[in-house]
């Protein structure tokens, strides 16, 4: 970090890595001239665990529990990107029912991630009351996850060729009830937060990013859409069954922290629309493509054969990753989550490069906070929405 040469006395302040507003183990070395930010240097790597190297020494089904530790608040998306790559390499068809259930889980995970962004974001800028309301709705989403997958977090629900299990009895009605309830709560958020004059003073005109600047920095997700660029991979790539549903891309023109807040708030309403359509049009059929499982078993095993005794046990998939290169991506809550995958005719990937949206979006932070006040760092960092698990990997 270059220290500016001026006649004034500058103060260097360490924010983090143990700071409640850093959203993880992020450290910022901030140079201050009074209350004005002169320079800011993010220090990363406190949560680095070598996730890419671990992937090169695991079969895909073995690696699935690891990927939920990237963005641990939106684990369905990390699971989706992990199974989408091998499915495309192996030309594996996902049953329509499984695809619809995947969409439902992805959008519920998007809502949970946005809720867990909104609550601490409001607390960062001094509004404690909405935090408790928001976490109440988040618990309902986690109850749905627990009923369907058995886990509130780290679900391990996606499988190559489908999902781990079908939806339990009564889950669809419970989810539809939540959708109706949540739409009324979003209206309450708008009354409580959006029109609050103190909130508007803290976020309006703070951390402005232009559309061209956002593209040049490689930003994605709400960061890009809040700068006037209506770019959403669910519309662009049409992965899973998103092209079968009616919904709109949410975007704003202002490019400030308020615009990023509005994009995420409106996205939750669009997610509810997608979930309702998927639940009402949920097709029948299998929830998993069993051909994706590489069985190597005799057609007529003998009665006392060791293999025959354990025929009811599901073996792990043993298919090979073909020798090709592939880049797959999904629209995660924080932006474009991508994987560059290289296979080499073995069960393990030769290269597994992760493109985390939080890491890319965080790079613009030093530019945004310069010439701003110290208190605005919390607002700007909160509006970016980062999780250090995926930033450091």
Curated annotation (Swiss-Prot):
Kindly give the PROSITE patterns that the UniProt entry links to this protein.
COMPLEX1_49K
Q: Which Gene3D superfamilies match?
A: Cytochrome-c3 Hydrogenase, chain B
Q: Where in the cell is it found?
A: Plastid, Chloroplast thylakoid membrane
Sorted alphabetically, the Gene Ontology BP terms of this entry are:
photosynthesis, light reaction
Quote the subunit structure annotation.
NDH is composed of at least 16 different subunits, 5 of which are encoded in the nucleus.
| Annotated source species | Olimarabidopsis pumila
Regarding protein family, the annotation reads: Belongs to the complex I 49 kDa subunit family.
Record's GO cellular component, any one?
chloroplast thylakoid membrane
Taxonomy, superkingdom: Eukaryota
Record function comment: NDH shuttles electrons from NAD(P)H:plastoquinone, via FMN and iron-sulfur (Fe-S) centers, to quinones in the photosynthetic chain and possibly in a chloroplast respiratory chain. The immediate electron acceptor for the enzyme in this species is believed to be plastoquinone. Couples the redox reaction to proton translocation, and thus conserves the redox energy in a proton gradient.
Q: What is its EC number?
A: 7.1.1.-
Molecular function terms in GO for this entry?
NAD binding; oxidoreductase activity, acting on NAD(P)H, quinone or similar compound as acceptor; quinone binding
Q: How does it sit in the membrane?
A: Peripheral membrane protein
User: NCBIfam families recorded for this chain?
Assistant: PRK06075.1, PRK07415.1
Query: Which keywords does this Swiss-Prot/TrEMBL entry list?
Result: Chloroplast, Membrane, NAD, NADP, Plastid, Plastoquinone, Quinone, Thylakoid, Translocase, Transport
Which parts of the chain span the membrane according to its record? none
Q: What name goes with this protein?
A: NAD(P)H-quinone oxidoreductase subunit H, chloroplastic
**Signal peptide range in chain numbering:** none
- Which reaction does this enzyme catalyse, per its entry? a plastoquinone + NADH + (n+1) H(+)(in) = a plastoquinol + NAD(+) + n H(+)(out); a plastoquinone + NADPH + (n+1) H(+)(in) = a plastoquinol + NADP(+) + n H(+)(out)
PANTHER family noted in UniProt:
NADH DEHYDROGENASE [UBIQUINONE] IRON-SULFUR PROTEIN 2, MITOCHONDRIAL, NADH-UBIQUINONE OXIDOREDUCTASE 49 KDA SUBUNIT
Which Pfam families does the UniProt record give?
Complex1_49kDa
